[in-house]
Amino acid sequence: MFVPTLDAKIVGEVINEYRKRKGISQEVLSGLADIGRTHLSAIERGKRKPTLETLYRIATALDVNMSDIVIEIEKRIKL
């Protein structure tokens, strides 16, 4: 079974796009998700991969299901 590598850059792009659609800054999102702004910035730039807990916090702060973010990531990995 093929399991694609989770590309940190794709994860970051997806989170960044969801944040911008919501119309909030990294500062606001990091506060809502209870993570550091520099940590969020590193995730969005593809420098760090979020843990499941962090991804859940980000999704909750964005008022979206974590599965929606994961589905979008999967779509881009398969392209």
Where are these regions (language model features)?
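A short, Lys/Arg-rich alpha-helix, primarily the initiator
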Residues: 1-21
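Residue-level detection of the helix-turn-helix DNA-binding "recognition helix"
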Residues: 20, 34, 45-47, 74
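The alpha-helix within a helix-turn-helix
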Residues: 19, 30, 59
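DNA major-groove recognition helix of helix-turn-helix/homeodomain DNA-binding modules
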Residues: 53-68
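Short alpha-helical DNA-recognition segment
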Residues: 23-42
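Helix-turn-helix DNA-binding elements, focusing on the entry/boundary residues of the two helices
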Residues: 15, 26, 37, 52-55
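Short, charged recognition helix plus adjacent turn
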Residues: 2-4, 68-79
